Amino acid sequence: MEQSTTRSLLKGKILKILTLLLLVRLGLYIPVPGVELDILTQGQTSNPMFGFAKTLVGNSFLGIGSLGILPYINASIIIQLLTPLFPNLERLQKEEGELGRQQISRYTRYLTCIWAIVLSSAIAFFLIKPITFGWSLKLGLEIVLSLTVGSILSMWFAELITEESLGNGSSMIIFINIVGGIPNNLSSLSKTFSAANLASAIPLLLTGLGIYLGIVLIIIFFQESYKKITIVSAKQLNLTTSAQTQSERLANNSFIPLKLNQGGIMPLVFSSTIAVVFMYPAQILLSSALLTNAAGLASKLLTIYSFGINFVLVIFFSCFYVSLVLKPKDMSENLGKMAYSIPGIRQGKETTKYLEKVINRLAFIGGLFLAFLAFFPLFVGNFIQFGLFKNLTSLLILIGVITDTTSQITGYLVSTRYEGLK
């Protein structure tokens, strides 16, 4: 009876999440009032800055939900960056508990609204205005209002999804948007191979699929890998028996699992949103009259610049995000309070330094791997023209969301069964 109730509750949660994700996708296809889609389609070729708009909104045309959770993610990044700098924010995060976290969430929502208005205004007055006939201030304000409301709704949907405790709402929205773009990628891939000679296309396709599946396995291994830091209690250290050697006792001890990719997909999410800001001046430079005679060289330089920016940002946000999630000093203090220690490491400052060293090393290695996924398409594209390699970071996000959601569902089922046994 209890098991059937648990399953029905789980089905209800999944149905609610799928409904909210469907609403997010529908928002992408509801056109902004007063903006004709055919004019925007022409603008993609006539206005070189429309490429930047497409990157920003994540869609080929403009819908009221095109901004999505981009302002929400940017606001979260800004709040996290400001927290260590302002004592009041740090106190709310560390000392106020749930009430403090709710207050920080409230600040994040306020900042999301402000940032959504800024981005909507930039899109309306700098990108849509030059390619729209009959422009007026009223039309501009309607566009800003539509995009802002769509972004706020996306933020609300993300928080509702997170409240179901089956995964992160923002990550799931990014996931569903990536999945929505898969048909276009497969269509372009089929056109590539249909245009090629069939005899040469089959070996190329098999080679590409083999490499792609290998990368999937590597990503899964990377996502699930972690380092064990053995910890022992004071009683275990003092316990000496002839039947149990020290090495045997250590083998049975508890440990702290530190994931190799502690930041998960968040460094990629952060870097992709911030990279857009750095790409803005590069897009202007590329479209300027000074580079009209060197368009090919400018395009290559822009590609190298793009990968370089993403490489640096991914490593930075990998280390930064881990520093927010894991606090070596707090971990050391908690171990001391529980009378646990790391074998061979003294309690106190030495434990803090050791944990800091291990965490920083893991964060850097994780950042390098994420950066490798960003760089890999650039190198493999010189040898294999395989469209799926262009979205390896998206692949990592897909795998990360799937594994995280699976573990959350498993944890939910286990916890409900445990509560039923009480």
UniProtKB/Swiss-Prot annotation:
The keyword Kinase does not apply. It is found in: Plastid, Chloroplast thylakoid membrane. Its main location: plastid. Keywords: Chloroplast, Membrane, Plastid, Protein transport, Thylakoid, Translocation, Transmembrane, Transmembrane helix, Transport. The central subunit of the protein translocation channel SecYE. Consists of two halves formed by TMs 1-5 and 6-10. These two domains form a lateral gate at the front which open onto the bilayer between TMs 2 and 7, and are clamped together by SecE at the back. The channel is closed by both a pore ring composed of hydrophobic SecY resides and a short helix (helix 2A) on the extracellular side of the membrane which forms a plug. Component of the plastid Sec protein translocase complex, which is composed of at least SecY, SecE and SecG. This is Protein translocase subunit SecY. It comes from Emiliania huxleyi (Coccolithophore). The gene is secY.
